[in-house]
């Protein structure tokens, strides 16, 4: 149910307004995974399907947004597990053992479908800038009359990044197509910058843009993992960044200093996760938790392909982030001096 302490604090804050209600009276009822949310009515069926083919009486489970369905789709509903969805935007969710010690504006608090507390880091930008650079390389190849398969091009360039310096050799990139609240950037301007003596080569160029795709996420996660000392046994990755086997997965493992698993089913996404939650409501055994149902009946013990963090990669990403933070003013100044 709702946090009673927060409910009481809110009601106390509005005491002088003389509203004819208490906040809990106007909030919807809380339902957790496995509970019944009712059945589809005749009126509802007609609204959804005026043709009349959709029948009333269909059982409904509690609805979830992208966060809850993503947790179900990646089997990351247990304490000390989490998932990272990396595509146009990127977010990470970690299921907590206990409440955080402090309030952090970089972190959002949500719950699993079963009601366990989850810390979330959400960033507006991830692969858009990276994709734009890959598109530029395709244009270069086409200028020589070479038709390049995009999947092959992504694979070649991503794997080339693995040959780069662990700290990207003096290159930095900010992938901000839009602002990033985590770093206090109100607007975004994609930016690539390097030192005059940087090791400027293709491997470092690709590595810095892969780092940039996860850099803001890492800043938020460092608060969670290093300041709050939250423990994570395993993270499940899903989304476009992980399509090239072992590359995005390894870089995320370095960013978090934690094992990262990628399952073949991870690409199924939210709709499949919602279907799993509906299936749990209908098929769960007495006393069977969502965690048990997913692990035993859906995923069957399958943990996916797991990559452990490489200590050298972890140290390299940490060094990159130190330089990234120090130069953040250049990104903010670019937004100020290049109005849209």
Q: Language model features by range: what are they?
A:
Residues 1-24, 32-236, 241-340:
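Active-site core segments that coordinate phosphate-bearing ligands/cofactors
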Residues 29:
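N-terminal beta-strand-loop-alpha-helix module at the start
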């Amino acid at each position: 149910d709702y946090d009673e302490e927060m409910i009481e604090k809110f009601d106390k804050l509005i005491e002088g307004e003389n509203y004819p209600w208490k906040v809990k009276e106007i909030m919807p009822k809380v339902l957790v995974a496995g509970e019944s949310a009712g059945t589809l009515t005749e009126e509802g069926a007609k609204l959804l399907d005026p043709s009349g083919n959709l029948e009333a009486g269909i059982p409904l489970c509690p609805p979830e947004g992208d966060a809850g369905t993503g947790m179900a789709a990646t089997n990351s509903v247990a304490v000390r597990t989490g998932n990272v969805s990396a595509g146009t935007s990127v977010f990470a969710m970690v299921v907590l053992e206990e409440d955080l010690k402090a309030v952090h504006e970089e972190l959002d608090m949500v719950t699993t479908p079963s009601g366990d507390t989850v810390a979330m880091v959400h960033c507006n930008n991830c692969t858009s800038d990276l994709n734009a650079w890959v598109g530029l390389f395709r244009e270069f190849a086409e200028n020589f009359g070479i038709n390049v398969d995009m999947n092959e091009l992504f694979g070649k360039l991503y794997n080339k990044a693995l040959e780069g310096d662990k700290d990207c050799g003096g290159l930095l990139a900010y992938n901000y197509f839009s602002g990033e609240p985590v770093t206090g950037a109100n607007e975004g301007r994609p930016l690539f910058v390097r030192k005059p003596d940087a090791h400027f080569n293709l491997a470092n160029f690709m590595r810095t843009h892969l780092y940039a795709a996860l850099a803001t996420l890492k800043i938020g996660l460092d608060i969670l993992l290093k300041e709050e000392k939250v423990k994570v046994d395993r993270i499940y990755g899903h989304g476009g960044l992980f399509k090239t086997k072992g590359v995005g997965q390894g870089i995320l493992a370095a960013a978090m200093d934690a094992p990262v698993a990628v399952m073949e089913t991870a690409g199924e996404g939210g709709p499949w996760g919602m279907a799993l939650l509906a299936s749990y409501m209908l098929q769960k055994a007495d006393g069977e938790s969502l965690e048990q149902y997913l692990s035993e009946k859906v995923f069957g013990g399958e943990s996916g392909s797991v990559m452990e963090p490489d200590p050298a990669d972890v140290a390299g990403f940490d060094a990159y982030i130190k330089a990234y933070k120090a130069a953040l003013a250049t990104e903010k100044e670019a937004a100020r001096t290049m109005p849209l």
